[in-house]
């Protein structure tokens, strides 16, 4: 069962090769019958009134690694001092800065990243506990800010939490069809290459984020991209149970 994002989308992934060689059956989130969503079904959908009542802006950072570059791309958001989230936070207005909660990736390097944040912006930043589950933070957020194509993107899409993605990556490591659909999110003000423009959008639209999200989440390009991430099935438990019994 798939338990993390970005399995089918990369052009090359050792994990995929191993799974295809040694697994009898693979249940992916994109399974045509909707039998691969086991991981995602632990989440409940968020309701629009909840979004409107939430105040928090959640900055959810990707893994920043000092080595192991087979796992991390050589892009700004994987660099401890060049992460675009720094500029995004810098250009938020004072009110929005106070609404920010930063959730660093649960990894040993994150303690050092936390120190960099504090050095840049002193102690005027709220941090979530590094190894805590992101689940509660998703449901308490009016807007989530991510900087990578990874599991949080899929989780946010599934739950329905408004989010923006900031990344100047050209995504050459991903399949072309996937990237084409992803880049169409720019016109919907979801995907940004510039953290400054992303901050301007949030400053200008914070009060109406829920209304914006209600509109864009019904757009054709949004739905097409969402459908590349996972397939939903209402009677999933019954269906997967029957499937496994018959294997």
Q: How would you label these PLM feature ranges?
A:
Residues 226-247:
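C-terminal alpha-helical cap of glycosyltransferases
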Residues 8-10, 33-37, 67-68, 108-116, ...:
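Short, charged/polar "capping" segments at the starts of alpha-helices
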Residues 1, 29, 103, 166-168:
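Generic beta-sheet signal
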Residues 34-39, 52, 61, 118, ...:
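Catalytic binding pocket for nucleotide-activated donors in carbohydrate/polymer assembly enzymes
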Residues 1-40, 153:
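Active-site and donor-binding regions of nucleotide-sugar-utilizing enzymes
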Residues 103-159, 169-170:
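Donor nucleotide-activated moiety binding/catalytic core segment of transferases
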Residues 40-119:
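Conserved catalytic-core segment of nucleotide-activated headgroup transferases in glycan assembly
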Residues 23-24, 97, 160-162:
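A short helix->loop->beta-strand "cap" motif at the edges of active sites that frequently abuts
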């Amino acid at each position: 069962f798939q338990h993390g994002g970005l399995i089918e989308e990369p052009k090359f992934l050792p994990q995929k090769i191993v799974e295809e060689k040694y697994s009898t059956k693979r249940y992916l989130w994109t399974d045509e019958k909707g039998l691969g969503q086991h991981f995602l079904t632990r989440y409940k959908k968020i309701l629009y009134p909840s979004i409107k009542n939430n105040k928090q802006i959640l900055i959810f950072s990707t893994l920043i690694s000092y080595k192991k570059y087979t796992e991390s791309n050589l892009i700004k958001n994987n660099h401890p001092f060049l992460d675009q989230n720094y500029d995004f936070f810098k250009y938020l207005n004072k009110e929005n800065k106070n609404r920010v909660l930063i959730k660093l990736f649960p990894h040993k390097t994150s303690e050092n990243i936390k120190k960099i944040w504090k050095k840049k912006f002193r102690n005027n930043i709220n941090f979530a506990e590094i190894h805590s589950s992101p689940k509660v933070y998703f449901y308490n957020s009016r807007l989530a800010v991510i900087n990578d194509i990874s599991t949080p993107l899929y989780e946010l899409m599934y739950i329905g939490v408004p989010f923006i993605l900031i990344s100047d990556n050209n995504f050459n490591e991903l399949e072309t069809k996937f990237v084409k659909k992803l880049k169409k999110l720019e016109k919907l003000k979801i995907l940004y290459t510039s953290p400054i423009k992303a901050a301007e959008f949030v400053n200008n639209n914070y009060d109406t984020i829920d209304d914006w999200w209600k509109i864009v989440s019904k757009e054709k390009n949004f739905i097409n991209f969402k459908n590349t991430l996972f397939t939903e099935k209402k009677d999933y438990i019954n269906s997967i149970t029957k499937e496994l019994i018959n294997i």
